[in-house]
């Protein structure tokens, strides 16, 4: 329920790999904004149609599953400005789908080799793709408050997916620059950035002490060492690594799906792309893949064709994620993935899962210790370990942090909204103060 009264000074947006959220910043409070169905999270999925429609959020998936099979044959297409030879799809295949569903775009923000995608004789820069989601969230905020919202504090990972461990690397600098550009394209006139774990710290309990803030999301793991005192919040160290919950999904694909379907018979490059949704996007856009699978032949190739070309790839990979989530509350999970032409059922144990992701957990442990060392803190100095992010509910992750800081209190922040609430808090601080000074 929203409080009445007041004009917001800005907003905070947590743009995530899987989900995104927005919070309005008022001079006296911060409100996370729900959609009409009462949901704070908007899936970070995009629907693109050849007729010009650009849709973000839950509606994107609904539209694609209704029309994703529709195609236009070259010769009947009027979108290529200089004729069909101007169109990549014509040069490659002779037809194209009328719509596309994109997800995990955030994972490509810092990819120096990825400028965007192409469909219907048009380039879609990655900044334009991100701007669709940011525009969706800005409009949600404006509907909630009845005012124009042109200021935003955008969260960003300490280290972007695929960008290496140095926050100052060219790839990470590019990721932050692209976020700013996307926000401007979405209609924001004033844009500030804030590291996601720092934002989560702003939203947490403000009791004095040293806090290890661990933000384990879908795309990255970020950690902040914070110290709260009567004078305020001090950020003593920030670190991160491009290991997120989606990497754990990939491990399940490697160790459960691939053996069950015999996919290890495939070329290694193809199997590597199949592990992730971002890889699947590239495969589905490759006009030569169908003919390659036909040449390879065999059960594995037929399984891949069923996954990619039945119109149900998204549901297939969400089933893998669902099994991972179920293992956070149960000792075993049933991985049920069914698409036309393919039915897979496998029982996965938590023991198998935790053994399989041990290398990723070791990486998280090393990054956390590195952050503490950079802050000049010993593990016994930590008063509170605060965890946030959708992947922070994984029991093995929480055990790792308990073992690292056994004397600290483990506090579970709001897994999906603590970052956006903190970004809203930062927006309130920045622009309430600035407006007071200039008013």
Language model region names:
Residues 41-48, 228-339, 435:
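Phosphate-binding glycine-rich/basic clefts of nucleotide- and phosphate-handling proteins
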Residues 1-115, 244, 248-269:
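Early-domain small/polar-rich strand-loop-helix modules and first-structured segments
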Residues 175-176, 186-194, 380, 398-425:
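Conserved phosphate-binding/catalytic loops in two-lobed NTP-binding clefts
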Residues 97, 101, 122-134, 244-249, ...:
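Phosphate/oxyanion-binding active-site loops and adjacent basic polyanion-contact surfaces
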Residues 1-12, 17-19, 25-30, 89-213, ...:
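Nucleotide/phosphate-binding catalytic cleft detector across ATP-hydrolyzing
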Residues 45, 192-204, 249-255, 359, ...:
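Glycine-rich phosphate-binding/hydrolytic loop that grips phosphoryl groups
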